């Protein structure tokens, strides 16, 4: 570990914190329907979209209607994307003559992008046309992110409102998230990435001749526009197979820093939106503090594990840290930081190969996802995921002191706790259930490229990533098979919608309740004690659930490596 590496981490944290309040204030005005700096230009477009769609922006929805609209929209998006992938060979903007995507891969890919997972069992430059990348994937990058933001805002309204049955309008919230937040920021970022050397063209792939006289095909395309929203919307799916490790997808150290920043900025700022809308910004800062503590711990362990030679590397006499699978233009510090950011934020983009990390270095990204993607998390999804843990933490605190649990003046009762636990428990069911199946059936065992505990980790990582809607992978797993495409897609669907629907049910229940005045016995939820309790609940409920599985994978691999034991390649 070096001073330069710690300075990069400190600078990143400082810039994120500096942007929380201004962006949080802006988004609060957007979702409250107030005038913003962009209103003169965008308000007429917003009203025009409502007229075309037949939407009454003043008509609000109950939680059930809100959930129904959300599901209907996502089903329509899935059908259209699946059709586009299956028909891409017949459609324009296909200069590389890409064939139609196979049915199981199209099912997996459509599910992946609709759920904001962006798991990729394919290489983008060898599988998809420009039209599929733009109209299919980039479009879903916008609307899947906006859908998550809308659900988060609905949950915030559940805490902020009292004695009402409505949570706002899904159509209005999603439109405003896209039009006022995602599109403007993505446009600025895309232009910046082009200035750094990122391609943005509809021209065919470039045919080049190498110095040895060999012919080479250089893949290009509308890269910058997709990368901008893939990071900002915590989608993560790469235009190229190597994702952000590819020089065309992440050309410079500055583009790398901006990509890391854009992954966290909206999720962090939404905690401030929460504080503002419930009338106490300290509540948002407390939640952000809990997220920050978990994030800092993860960065520290990952950076230490990758920067220090140990285990097999130490036995080989290597002292420069683990550079395998990392880009020299980024180095160990930026690669470790990126890995923790992308798995904490449900993004899934990578600038280094996680499969090549040390056992402990790979454990932290895995654990980040298993905690439920609540360390900043996906845009919207991170906040509502952490608020689910807040409900459980407040319930536990109430049990300890023998009082009816309250949060922000709302009683936390059986219905809220049941819905919270449903949202929490569906993730380990998918992650561990499918991992168990894959380790005993031939189709599952054919996937990992490594034997021993690392092969198990490759399977566990895949299902963890899918259910957590992250999308990153241990690249040694051959996932483009009928078995993995199908089971991973099921994990993505359950991990997305079996969390969002209980969250909206909690929001509807809370919005209907009366607000109780604070009393001497009210547990303060803006101080260090609450932050510690929340972190403890996340680690106990989210972390201990997976300890046996982690012990069979990265933990065993770490101790085996320390003893100099390696495992042969092969499933």
Curated annotation (Swiss-Prot):
Keyword hit for Oxidoreductase:
no
Q: Which GO terms describe its cellular component?
A: plasma membrane
Q: Where in the cell is it found?
A: Cell inner membrane
- Main localization is membrane
Membrane topology reported for the UniProt record: Multi-pass membrane protein
Q: Does the keyword Cell inner membrane apply?
A: yes
In its UniProt record, a GO molecular function of this protein is: P-type potassium transmembrane transporter activity
Q: Which stretches are transmembrane? A: 5-25, 64-84, 136-156, 179-199, 220-240, 254-274, 285-305, 330-350, 375-395, 421-441, 488-508, 527-547
Swiss-Prot/TrEMBL keywords: Cell inner membrane, Cell membrane, Ion transport, Membrane, Potassium, Potassium transport, Transmembrane, Transmembrane helix, Transport
Q: Name one Pfam family in it.
A: KdpA
Q: What interactions and quaternary structure are annotated?
A: The system is composed of three essential subunits: KdpA, KdpB and KdpC.
Similarity field: Belongs to the KdpA family.
Task: Report the protein's function.
Answer: Part of the high-affinity ATP-driven potassium transport (or Kdp) system, which catalyzes the hydrolysis of ATP coupled with the electrogenic transport of potassium into the cytoplasm. This subunit binds the periplasmic potassium ions and delivers the ions to the membrane domain of KdpB through an intramembrane tunnel.
This protein's name? Potassium-transporting ATPase potassium-binding subunit
Q: Which organism is it from?
A: Methylorubrum extorquens (strain CM4 / NCIMB 13688)
Classification lineage: Bacteria, Pseudomonadati, Pseudomonadota, Alphaproteobacteria, Hyphomicrobiales
């Amino acid at each position: 570990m070096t001073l330069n590496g710690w300075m990069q981490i400190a600078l990143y944290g400082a810039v994120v914190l500096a942007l929380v309040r201004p962006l949080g204030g802006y988004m609060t005005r957007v979702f409250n329907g107030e005038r913003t700096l962009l209103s003169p230009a965008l308000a007429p477009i917003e009203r025009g979209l409502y007229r075309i769609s037949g939407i009454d922006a003043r008509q609000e929805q109950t939680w059930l209607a809100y959930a129904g609209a959300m599901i209907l929209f996502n089903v329509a998006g899935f059908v259209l994307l699946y059709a586009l992938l299956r028909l891409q060979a017949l459609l324009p903007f296909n200069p590389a003559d890409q064939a139609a995507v196979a049915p199981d891969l199209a099912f997996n890919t459509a599910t992946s992008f609709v759920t904001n997972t962006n798991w990729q069992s394919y290489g983008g430059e060898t599988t998809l046309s420009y039209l599929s990348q733009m109209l299919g994937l980039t479009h879903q990058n916008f609307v899947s992110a906006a859908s998550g933001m809308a659900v988060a805002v609905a949950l915030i309204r559940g805490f902020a409102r009292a004695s009402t049955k409505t949570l706002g309008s899904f159509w209005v919230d999603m439109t405003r998230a896209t039009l006022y937040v995602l599109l403007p920021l993505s446009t600025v970022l895309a232009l910046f990435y082009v200035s750094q050397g990122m391609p943005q063209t509809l021209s065919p792939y470039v045919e080049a001749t190498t110095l040895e006289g060999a012919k080479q095909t250089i893949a290009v395309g509308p890269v910058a526009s997709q990368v901008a929203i893939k990071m900002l919307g915590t989608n993560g799916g790469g235009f190229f197979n190597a994702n952000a490790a590819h020089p065309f997808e992440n050309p410079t150290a500055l583009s790398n820093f901006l990509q890391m920043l854009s992954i966290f900025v909206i999720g962090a700022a939404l905690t401030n939106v929460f504080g503002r809308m419930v009338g106490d910004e300290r509540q948002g800062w407390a939640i952000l503090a809990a997220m920050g503590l978990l994030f800092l711990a993860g960065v520290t362990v990952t950076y230490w594990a990758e920067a220090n030679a140990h285990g097999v590397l130490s036995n080989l006499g290597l002292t420069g840290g683990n550079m395998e699978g990392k880009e020299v233009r980024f180095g160990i510090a930026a690669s470790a930081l990126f890995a923790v950011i992308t798995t904490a934020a449900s993004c899934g983009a990578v600038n280094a190969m996680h499969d090549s990390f040390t056992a402990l270095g790979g454990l932290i990204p895995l654990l980040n996802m298993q905690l439920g993607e609540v360390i900043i998390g996906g845009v919207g999804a991170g906040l509502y995921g952490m608020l689910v843990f807040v409900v459980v933490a407040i319930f536990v605190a109430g049990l300890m002191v023998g009082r009816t649990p309250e949060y922000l003046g709302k009683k936390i009762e059986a219905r809220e706790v049941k819905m919270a636990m449903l949202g929490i428990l569906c993730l380990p069911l998918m992650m561990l259930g499918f991992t168990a199946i894959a380790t005993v059936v031939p189709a599952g065992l054919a996937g990992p490229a490594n034997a021993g505990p690392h092969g198990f980790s490759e399977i566990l990582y895949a299902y963890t990533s899918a259910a957590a809607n992250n999308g990153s992978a241990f690249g040694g797993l051959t996932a483009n098979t009928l078995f993995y495409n199908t089971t991973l897609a099921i994990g993505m669907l359950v991990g997305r919608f079996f969390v969002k629907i209980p969250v909206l049910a909690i929001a509807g229940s809370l919005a209907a309740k009366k607000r109780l005045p604070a009393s001497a016995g009210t547990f303060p939820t803006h101080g260090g004690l609450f932050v510690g309790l929340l972190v403890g609940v996340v680690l106990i409920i989210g972390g201990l659930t997976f300890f046996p599985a982690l012990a069979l994978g990265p933990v065993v691999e770490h101790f085996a490596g320390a003893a100099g034991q390696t495992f042969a390649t092969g499933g």
